[in-house]
Amino acid sequence: MNHATQRVAIVTGASRGIGAAIAERLAADGFTVIINYSGNPAPADELVGKIEQRGGRALSVKADVSDAAAVAGLFDSAEQAFGGVDVLVNNAGVIALAPVADMRDEDADRLLDINLKGSFNAMREAAKRLRDNGRIINFSSSVVGLLQPGYGMYAASKAAIEALTSVLAKELRGRNITVNAVAPGPTATGLFLDGKTPELIERLAKMAPLERLGTPDDIAAAVAFLAGADGGWINGQTLRANGGII
């Protein structure tokens, strides 16, 4: 694929974990990838180097998705470097767990600012600036269906994403842009594993009929399907990539 026809994908929160796996997979599939990060640039820059060593094209761009102006700047950078954007993968997110009665205001605000408002900011920008025949892929979570104690605010922030996904898919009628969400189950990332005992991790791994945790590559494969030609008839849906946990 030559550079003039290469499709361009923005992946938010892409410097590590699931986001990094998505960036690598999309680059392997022929996409130019914008690797968004919000903190330390080193992992994002390292990932750019890895993709370029394999013959791909990538650019790291710092932006806090909870800041609408920063998200607009993220799209500006992509357009200036590569001429436009075809795919948005709304991967950036945080987690904070507590029973509803014990949830701190600052934790609730951060969940809503990043998981909901951050995803909304990127969706809004993509709705205005994505090229026709594009893809918007949001991130929900399988906790929306599991409804576990302690996950209330986190699940709420992700349930809202599923609603926005279905609505935006209808609002973009006529442009051949699909809007879907991926809802991972327990996945072996640092974000998921940190603070958990080996016994708890083993118990969580056994919850799904496939009796293992998901991997970042499992989730990246689901995203790649939705971003590619084979996923073109899927629209307004949430794909639950969780090994059958629900």
Predicted regions and their residues:
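Active-site loop-to-helix junction immediately N-terminal to the catalytic Tyr of the SDR YXXXK motif
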Residues: 95, 103, 147-155, 167
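Short C-terminal tail/terminal secondary-structure segment
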Residues: 146, 206, 224, 235-246
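Substrate-binding pocket helix/loop in short-chain dehydrogenase/reductase
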Residues: 99-100, 104-112, 192, 200, ...
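Conserved glycine-rich cofactor-binding loop
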Residues: 15-16
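Conserved glycine-rich Rossmann-like NAD(P)H-binding loop of the short-chain dehydrogenase/reductase
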Residues: 29-46
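Active-site helix of classical SDR
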Residues: 123, 157
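Alpha-helical segment proximal to the catalytic Tyr-Lys
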Residues: 128-129, 170-174, 232
